[in-house]
């Protein structure tokens, strides 16, 4: 993942989600809110309220993000998030799958709602993020991101 130097990190209301795991149920149009996602707040990258990457290490540099997840409808799931091979987030013994199906999406997601208030007539600034090596695997060493030189 790469945020160019011109990414609008000083735009205070801006809090884009850059990837998320979504769940949905058979027969329902609405999805559950994502339980696992990364969000940029003033140039820092967070998983909920846990800092994953500081601004000085996020903007203008390539960063490798890896998720290790045990998907479960019971309280035996876990989540680990690695930044450049360093464990930055770990949570165990919680429900990680809240629907019948799961999908992963990445890009820049800004929306009005979810507890975020934007000023009246707020205009979202131009934003660019580059992604490379996005993949899923049963083993970390088989992820595409681990084969990029």
Label each region the model flagged.
Residues 83-105:
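Short, solvent-exposed beta-strand-to-loop segments that form ligand-recognition rims
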Residues 1-42, 108-111, 115, 123-148:
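Secretory/extracellular carbohydrate-interaction modules
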Residues 45, 81:
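Short aromatic-centered micro-motifs
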Residues 2, 61-68, 82, 130-135:
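Residues within well-ordered beta-strands of beta-sheet-rich folds
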Residues 71-79, 88-90, 141-142:
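Substrate-binding/catalytic groove segments of enzymes
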